[in-house]
């Protein structure tokens, strides 16, 4: 055989396309597709990759898993450009569109609706003639849903920013350990604790803030005013107040709650002040999140714990030391604070409160509380909190309301039986109407720089709404009309005036919610406020034809919808209103139609509320 026959034949020169493929294969790939990861193959990166094409399988590449700096920056730039383009297109739509299309959508957006809810409203609730005139809006909503399909954009970061991008820092520092095993970040725990004491605690005041923070800073598990149970459930509830949390911290909210329940079971019936307070927050969380059975169990445990603690405090020997005496005072304040919260829940449930009024009167300070309140996380200079003044006023209001139990907690329908009022009920009605006039200057309804003062007045008007709504349906016997104040006498003797007083208070609740939203946003209201909003909505339901009542109903529905983004309970209440409106053949304002839609159901299963053609009024 000639030598030439032994030489190997050279391969042909690579074509341009083959060279390009080879170059792609040699390119560094930051992350592989899911199929290549599962089969442990080298991936070419760009979907569809060569392996998936060869195997004829779907190629799925999660680009967010690529943690290289260039990839992260590129995704961030693309996201910002997409948001800028989306904002410009929405502004153009609102600028050029008429009120028939824009105002209901604007009201829905203001209620913190998610992109799928907005798209569902446009595709299934917006009249077909208007949808065909605004195809660009349909396209915008599709882009929104595509952008959010893998990574939802948070509505608001935990550190909300002001227009100039500044934010405040928490004015306390507490350790995560040894109080919680869920997270170890002291800074995040401090922010959540301060957030809860900023927005929830002033109105739901049954924890001594200063002693709790002092003991939490100490890190001692034998502390008298702090415990892991109490810390974990406060952290869980604080996550509800911090809307727009990242997904990982949203899951931590559930873990905090489950950890608190585990720690409660570990107590095995032992009762202490932090345990009772932790039960109080657990009960609040279970109620607002729709866990009715858990709420009933926690409420029963809470009532028993408070009775046991109160008996121990009342039986202190006269030679008890200062710490024991201080603890007894704080137990009494805790009892009153939880009674106040129980009355708010009982008002809407129309049931007697699970906690009876404490036997000992609340401790009253003759000096105004000069502690400062800051609208964290937004930067603010701070205003005097007046927390102790508000606590005293709330206790006085609930003592009055408790004496009107027949009005507040009755579940009877309209009755023709004559209603005989006792002297105690007449006195309570007089005190209820005079309560607001006797408040100190720092708690007047015109004070709009403290959200908890607004919540207090919402609650007062909710009581008035329910009481006068009850009186309008029952004939009364008033043996001595001159003994009553003019307002009470007119309401008692004229059902029409009683109903007018009820609607007036409902409209005032709507006004206060607008003030709160303008100053701090709807998603900063404490969960207990939703009961006041729902009481006003049910009162206004039969009178939405009146323009003033109509506007109030729209703003209250938007506020309730904002609550439903954070908790489950308002969702069921809104559906209840929707069903009652259908049963009574009530035509609801069309501006509220979007708030009652369920975006998880297809359009064929949704039953729209009867409404007239909207000219619309935006929620200002």
UniProtKB/Swiss-Prot annotation:
It is found in: Nucleus. InterPro entries: Notoamide_regulator, Transcription_factor_dom_fun, Zn2-C6_fun-type_DNA-bd_sf, Zn2Cys6_DnaBD. Transcription factor that probably regulates the expression of the gene cluster that mediates the biosynthesis of notoamide, a fungal indole alkaloid that belongs to a family of natural products containing a characteristic bicyclo[2.2.2]diazaoctane core. It comes from Aspergillus versicolor. Its main location: nucleus. Notoamides have been shown to exhibit antitumoral activities. Notoamides A-C show moderate cytotoxicity against HeLa and L1210 cells with IC(50) values in the range of 22-52 mg/ml, but the IC(50) value of notoamide D is greater than 100 mg/ml. Moreover, notoamide C induces G2/M-cell cycle arrest at a concentration of 6.3 mg/ml. This is Notoamide biosynthesis transcriptional activator notL'. The lineage of its organism: Eukaryota, Fungi, Dikarya, Ascomycota, Pezizomycotina. GO terms for biological process: DNA-templated transcription. Keywords: DNA-binding, Metal-binding, Nucleus, Transcription, Transcription regulation, Zinc.
């Amino acid at each position: 055989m000639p030598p030439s026959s032994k030489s190997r034949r050279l391969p042909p020169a690579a074509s341009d396309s083959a060279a390009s493929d080879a170059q792609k294969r040699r390119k560094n790939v930051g992350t592989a597709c899911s199929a290549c990861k599962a089969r442990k193959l080298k991936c070419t990166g760009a979907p569809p990759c060569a392996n998936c094409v060869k195997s004829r399988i779907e190629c799925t590449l999660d680009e967010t898993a690529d943690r290289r700096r260039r990839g992260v920056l590129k995704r961030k730039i693309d996201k910002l450009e997409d948001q800028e383009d989306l904002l410009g297109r929405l502004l153009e739509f609102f600028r050029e569109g008429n009120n028939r299309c824009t105002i209901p959508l604007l009201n829905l957006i203001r209620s913190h609706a998610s992109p799928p809810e907005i798209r569902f409203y446009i595709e299934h609730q917006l009249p077909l003639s208007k949808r065909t005139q605004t195809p660009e809006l349909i396209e915008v909503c599709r882009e929104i849903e595509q952008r959010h399909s893998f990574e939802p954009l948070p509505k608001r970061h935990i550190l909300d920013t002001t227009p100039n991008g500044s934010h405040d820092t928490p004015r306390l520092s507490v350790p995560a350990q040894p109080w919680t095993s869920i997270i170890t970040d002291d800074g995040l725990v401090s922010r959540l604790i301060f957030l809860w004491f900023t927005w929830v605690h002033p109105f739901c005041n049954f924890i001594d803030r200063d002693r709790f923070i002092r003991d939490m800073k100490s890190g001692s598990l034998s502390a008298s005013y702090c415990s892991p149970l109490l810390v974990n459930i406060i952290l869980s509830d604080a996550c509800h107040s911090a809307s727009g949390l990242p997904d990982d911290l949203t899951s931590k909210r559930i873990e905090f709650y489950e950890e608190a329940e585990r720690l409660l079971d570990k107590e095995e019936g032992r009762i202490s002040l932090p345990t009772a307070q932790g039960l109080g927050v657990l009960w609040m969380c279970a109620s607002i999140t729709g866990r009715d059975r858990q709420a009933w169990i926690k409420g029963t445990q809470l009532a028993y714990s408070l009775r046991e603690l109160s008996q121990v405090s009342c039986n202190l020997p006269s030679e008890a030391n200062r710490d024991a005496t201080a603890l007894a005072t704080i137990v009494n304040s805790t009892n009153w604070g939880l009674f106040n919260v129980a009355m708010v829940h009982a008002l809407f449930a129309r049931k007697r409160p699970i906690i009876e009024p404490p036997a000992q009167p609340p401790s009253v300070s003759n000096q105004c509380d000069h502690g400062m309140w800051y609208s964290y996380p937004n930067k603010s200079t701070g205003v005097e909190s007046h927390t102790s003044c508000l606590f005293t006023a709330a206790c006085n209001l609930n003592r009055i309301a408790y004496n009107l139990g027949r009005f507040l907690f009755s579940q009877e329908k309209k009755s023709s039986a004559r209603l005989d009022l006792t002297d105690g009920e007449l006195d309570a009605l007089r005190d209820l109407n005079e309560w607001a006039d006797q408040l100190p200057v720092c708690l007047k309804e015109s004070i709009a720089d403290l959200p908890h003062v607004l919540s207090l007045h919402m609650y007062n008007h909710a009581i008035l709404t329910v009481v006068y709504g009850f009186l309008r349906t029952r004939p009364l016997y008033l043996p001595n009309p001159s003994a009553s104040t003019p307002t009470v006498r007119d309401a008692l003797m004229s059902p029409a005036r009683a109903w007018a007083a009820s609607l007036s208070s409902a409209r005032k609740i709507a006004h206060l919610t607008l003030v709160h939203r303008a100053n701090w946003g709807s998603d900063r209201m404490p969960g207990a406020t939703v009961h006041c909003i729902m009481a006003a909505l049910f009162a206004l339901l039969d009178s939405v034809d009146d323009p003033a009542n109509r506007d109030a109903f729209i703003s209250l529905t938007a506020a309730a919808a904002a609550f439903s983004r954070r908790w489950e309970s308002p969702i069921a209440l809104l559906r209840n209103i929707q069903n009652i409106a259908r049963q009574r053949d009530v035509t609801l304002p069309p501006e509220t139609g979007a708030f009652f839609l369920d975006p998880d159901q297809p359009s064929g299963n949704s039953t729209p509320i009867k409404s007239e053609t909207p000219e619309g009024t935006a929620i200002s």
